[in-house]
Amino acid sequence: MSEASGTFNWDDRSGKSDYANYGNRGERYLACVAYLGGKEERPSAVMCRGYYTFAYLWAVDFDGEKLKTRWLHSSNKKTTYQVMDAEGKQTTYTPAACSSGMGRNTMYANGNHNLSVGDVDGDGCDEIIWGSAALDHDGKMLYAVGFGHGDAIHLGDMNPDRPGLELFDVHEEKGEFAWDLHDAATGEILWKGGQEGADNGRGLAADIVAGSRGYEFWSSYGGFDKASRNQNPFNAVTGKEVGTRKPSMNFRIYWDGDVQDELLDGTSITKCTSSSTTDLGIHATSTSKKTFASLGMSPSSCNGTKATPCLQADLFGDWREEVIWWNTSNPSQLYIVSSTTDTKYRVPTLMHDHLYRMGVAWQNCAYNQPPHLGYYLPDHADSFQGVKDDATAIADLPQRNEILSRTYYNLQGQHIATPTNATQVYIVKERHADGTVTTKKFLRR
């Protein structure tokens, strides 16, 4: 084992005049792990300070003996920023204008109470998703959306019919728009809305409606009407309202064995569709079903009204996720709760998916958020050959009319180039002239 040693001075600004430390704004911290040099290198730790105004992100590597700076990003203004490299050389940059036109073109004032990590631009290296802005793997700006500070962030393949990943972000700025959904690689705004002038403190994106392709998204001030409040789910592909219920706005979770998300809030797990919500019997206080109390257990979520788990992740590898809560009767004890519901699908361990694994690493940061997969599970479940009565076969699905494009994936759902290995098993998604999408699994011999 090697012991890390070494300290580095922070830029310790204070004072109300520049707002850096006013109202504790200079003492807001985030952290994550990111493969900034590619997935074949060691990951870097990225330590972050400030997101209401000034924003500093320090990427540091450990070589087995010492901590070494990879880069230090400083966004002290809305229109310029600095990056210090590993040799201590600092360069000032002027980025492109933000996609919202709000004038916040850097990380300055664009940060959330949370962050995300993933290779959103497909270059093999991770980017840092800040909320209304994103940082490239080299510490330079990838883009800025510019809607400002937010409370919730969700990164995933929300629209499986367009390339890349999407980001759903809710905004606390009380501005013209309370939320937006944008391209995670470019910052292009795909949808935006919500009640004008609202402090939108809650929001979630998840695939909860089986008959509606893609994710749904909803928030405390959702919808597209600036004058009225709407908390119903909307579809990320079409932008249309797809439900009359108000789902919980906390964590998504794979629990009951189908390929849609369930919802976790506090110590309750529910199944939500476009028109109904079903309690799955995982809760602490309900009198109508078996409770933890009846089993002599007293679990609790964390973070007060945020009601988040100690951790949610696919710990045991069957692709359904476990939840960790703490024992209110004995805080030194933890409960690990796992689904006992059967499933017909066999899906690769979620921790093999890079986006999901990075999400588990940053999950306990500030306002905790759930991890998401880097692929759209309903498109891949059959390709994983997870159906029990045909669990190992490699078979082609029927081909439909003219093929317009092909996209290749490995068994973890990650994009790959055209397969060349002699015995590689891979998945191909084909888009057809009639608008349909088929998925096939191949073994190259």
Predicted feature locations:
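Beta-propeller-forming repeat regions
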Residues: 1-391
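C-terminal outer-membrane/trafficking sorting elements
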Residues: 391-445
